[in-house]
């Protein structure tokens, strides 16, 4: 397990534990369960991703700790509409406030303006956050292996499936992949190409880890996909699912940036 102490990720996780305590005081788990039951029906995230080639999870992100403000003119509803028209399979919506200037309500805003399923992109540390994701109308959650113990991964993925949520498990290296593979095969696997300590990006990380997976297992490459050549390189290694945010968010028209990178995805 990567030691995340003294990294940005470590600071984020510490803040998330503080945030969890505050949220529990504001609304107990039982109340959140009731909100989750009343949420709009799930849209199948994994299913949508598997039926587009390439399958693109297009991210709605205003800022990041490393880049600061990425998109000053930030309208989640408009961005969601543009992504759907461009051919995205799914959305990824940042809800972290402190480091990414996201907001819980952005999931519902984005979903209300398109038919795409949405991932709650956040740093979840407890099953409470998972139930909360469903209450916020998310269709999928992100579990970052570097932030969580094996027990937490098991418990939180189980909670997600009990609430009809899909699960994207994110890894950075071989050791984390080995841990992720202990979880249900229902989980989607994502490889983040960004080194947590240096923040350098190496697309070969996905290619290297892909070789350790059964051919049938869908793999999503995350971070650093910026040019059509990057996309082609992944496709040549039988990687057809992508999570892309910054490359779209920093352009005036995210839909045009999407088309420049991926062309027109086909339904399969």
UniProtKB/Swiss-Prot annotation:
One of its GO terms (biological process) is L-tryptophan biosynthetic process. Its EC number is 4.1.1.48. PROSITE patterns: IGPS. InterPro entries: Aldolase_TIM, Indole-3-glycerol_P_synth, Indole-3-glycerol_P_synth_dom, Indole-3-GlycerolPSynthase_CS, RibuloseP-bd_barrel. One of its GO terms (molecular function) is phosphoribosylanthranilate isomerase activity. It catalyses: 1-(2-carboxyphenylamino)-1-deoxy-D-ribulose 5-phosphate + H(+) = (1S,2R)-1-C-(indol-3-yl)glycerol 3-phosphate + CO2 + H2O. Gene3D superfamilies: Aldolase class I. Pathway: Amino-acid biosynthesis; L-tryptophan biosynthesis; L-tryptophan from chorismate: step 4/5. The keyword Lyase applies. Disulfide bonds: none annotated. Keywords: Amino-acid biosynthesis, Aromatic amino acid biosynthesis, Decarboxylase, Lyase, Tryptophan biosynthesis. CDD domains: IGPS (cd00331). PANTHER family: INDOLE-3-GLYCEROL-PHOSPHATE SYNTHASE, TRYPTOPHAN BIOSYNTHESIS PROTEIN. Belongs to the TrpC family. This is Indole-3-glycerol phosphate synthase. The gene is trpC.
């Amino acid at each position: 397990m990567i030691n995340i102490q003294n990294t940005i990720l470590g600071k984020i996780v510490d803040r998330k534990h503080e945030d969890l305590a505050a949220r529990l005081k504001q609304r107990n788990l039982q109340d959140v369960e009731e909100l989750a039951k009343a949420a709009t029906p799930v849209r199948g995230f994994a299913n949508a991703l598997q039926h587009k080639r390439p399958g693109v999870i297009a991210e709605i992100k205003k800022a990041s700790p490393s880049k600061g403000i990425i998109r000053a003119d930030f309208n989640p509803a408009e961005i969601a509409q543009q992504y759907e028209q461009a051919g995205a399979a799914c959305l990824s919506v940042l809800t972290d406030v402190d480091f990414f200037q996201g907001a819980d309500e952005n999931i519902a805003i984005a979903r209300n303006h398109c038919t795409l399923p949405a991932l709650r992109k956040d740093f979840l540390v407890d099953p409470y956050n998972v139930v909360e994701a469903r209450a916020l109308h998310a269709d999928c959650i992100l579990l970052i292996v570097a932030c969580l113990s094996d027990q937490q991964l098991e418990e939180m993925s189980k909670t997600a499936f009990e609430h009809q949520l899909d699960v994207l498990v994110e890894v950075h290296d071989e050791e984390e992949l080995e841990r992720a593979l202990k979880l249900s095969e229902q989980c989607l696997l994502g490889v983040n190409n960004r080194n947590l300590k240096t923040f350098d990006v190496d697309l070969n990380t996905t290619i290297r880890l892909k070789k350790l997976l059964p051919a049938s297992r869908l793999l999503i490459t995350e971070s650093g996909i910026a040019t059509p050549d990057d996309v082609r390189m992944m496709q040549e290694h039988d990687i057809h699912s992508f999570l892309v945010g910054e490359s779209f968010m920093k352009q005036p028209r995210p839909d045009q940036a999407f088309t420049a990178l991926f062309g027109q995805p086909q339904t399969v």
